[in-house]
Amino acid sequence: MRIAVVGGGINGLSCAWLLAQAGYKVDLYDRGKLASETSKASSKLLHGGIRYLEQYEFRLVREALKERDDWLRRVPSLTNPLRLVLPIYKNSKRSRWFIGIGLFLYDHLAGKSILPPSKWLSAKELLKIDSQLQSHDLIGGYEFSDGQMDDFKLAMWVAEQAIQIGVNVKENQPVDKVDVNGNLHVVGDIIHYDFIVNASGPWAVKLLEKSGITSPYRLDTVKGSHIVVSRKCEQSYLLEVPNESRIFFVLPWRENTLIGTTEVRQNLDDVVICSEEEKDYLLAAYNRYRKDSLKKEDIVDSYAGVRPLIYTAEDPNKATREYIIERDGKLLNIFGGKWTTALALARNVVNQLDRYCK
């Protein structure tokens, strides 16, 4: 059985790899280079997504926590465990008991994890860990576990596994359109497949529109921007954006500190960059928690990527991070998805194709 996978991000790569493992002959198409867009512009985290518990997305968080541990076990050379601190102040929007219940659920959903559970730290203990943390009105904080990765190198590792078992990778090969009968159109040619998997991420709906195919699902294309500053990160943090319900991360990254992310709706026809306003926003949020504040000159790098969120809310911060796999004839469309759950998503794709094709 011949399968075409459209999209060389982490979801497409994972689908191609596991489909080839299952015995399918797979061609993987990407309009540019593999993992060159959204998949290399993440927060570099392998995580369950503690904040998704606020949207009651227990299934997603459980799956992501299981997948987090699986990545850490499977590729230790490109991943590492991480202990993050979530400090709580008198004026924090989320109280100590609220965060405590959330982390209790997080630990419970993780099951028999390879990572240690969360624990409470007093203000005194936090300041002993990081003397530059803003101490005014500090109550204490929770320390909890997640994972970190080199997203681009890990995606390339998946690509290597796929290529080794026979996936035919076609880089710089844009797909013009597809149809529900298994026909894939590229410049100057129409190629027939037994099934096509549309794993083109933020461009999934756009490909359908170009193909004249309708779907009940919409994507909210949301830009997430990050800055890298020339400061060694001694402690990783999950922090509330001051005066907002949003959160952001402070993480170690190659002897520097990574700060992100933002959430700004993005037109796919526009250039995807971290704007000056976003840089100011992230610096201001970070500095509210520090005695040793940063200046714009401390920024040594910045990047941005577009996330394909299934449209479920006016506020993208409240949109689901779940994924949906939709079948339309000989076409499987993937909407949404997180980096951490890419292999779980791919297993679901394989299971669906096994039912339809075997």
Predicted regions and their residues:
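N-terminal Rossmann-like FAD-binding beta1-loop-alpha1 element of flavoenzymes
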Residues: R2-D27
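Flavin (primarily FAD) binding-site architecture
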Residues: N198-I213
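C-terminal catalytic lobe of FAD-dependent flavoproteins
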Residues: P216-K223, K232-C233, E240-L258, R265-K358
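Short hydrophobic core segments
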Residues: V6, H192-G201
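Dinucleotide-binding Rossmann-like beta1-alpha1 core, especially the glycine-rich loop
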Residues: K44-I129, F248
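Conserved beta-strand-loop-beta-strand element in the redox core of flavoprotein oxidoreductases
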Residues: V178-I191
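Glycine-rich FAD pyrophosphate-binding loop
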Residues: A20-A41
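Flavin (FAD/FMN) cofactor-binding and adjacent substrate-gating region
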Residues: I88-I165, K170, V178-V180, R254, ...
